[in-house]
Amino acid sequence: SERYWLDRPSGLPGNSAVPLVSVDGAMNHAFDGAMKPTEALMKSHYIHQAIASFGEVVARSRLMRLAPGAQVAEHVDFNYHWVSRVRIHIPIITNPQVNFYCGDESVHMAQGESWLFDSWRRHRVVNASDSARTHLVIDLAGSSRFWRIVRKADSLDNIVILPNDHSQPRVKTEQFPVAPVMAPGEMLAIVEQVLEDCESNPDNDSEMMLRYRHLLLDLVHDWREVWGLYGFNDGAFDRYRHILDRTARQLAPQPRVLVTASNNVGI
């Protein structure tokens, strides 16, 4: 039903989506909260079956529609949601004039195929046709079984999931997508990854690079100190917020004072 289709949060013209797995199973695009199947998914047995066939714990998942002649502008997915999750695209309605661009590669995702891509690379989508394109889009982190399949994908036979009205699919959904406070080890890993990416860009100023390295590692060290004393206790949140605010005040005002080498994102 058309009543399930929502405009995308980005406000891009011609982009709409039906939430299938969402926070509390409601009609939203949120990330932070227990994920549940929506009414739309419960009424779509075959789609329910397709998502369940992966056997994975899934995060936010949607039907995503791109109107005739519309496009998704080039961008990078750098929300915290994407630190540990990837996106699966399964084209439901498409045609050869719909193309996906990721980095320096382009591909037409054919109907019924299953595609996985690196959303940290710059990517965009163009629907140059006169008909709408609809994909089933599933976000997940993936178990070791899932990643073994990904590693062997080029040598595996295709698996066809046919509609089965007698099946009782169960979609496992994330219940704890975000910790109340980021663990210091996770923060350090993210900081080191960003710093390494920026240090790989020869155009970045070396003095500014050193300044940001010290600033961000100071953030991690002080975060770890508060974590060791208070953990998740309610009284700790003001202390964590103080560290974040202090760090933010020391950032340079320019939005691109440092730029990543991998995808040209400004820090």
Stretch-by-stretch model annotation:
Residues 91-111:
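A short beta-strand-loop-beta hairpin characteristic of the jelly-roll/cupin
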Residues 58-61, 85-89, 97, 122, ...:
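Extracellular structured ligand-interaction cores
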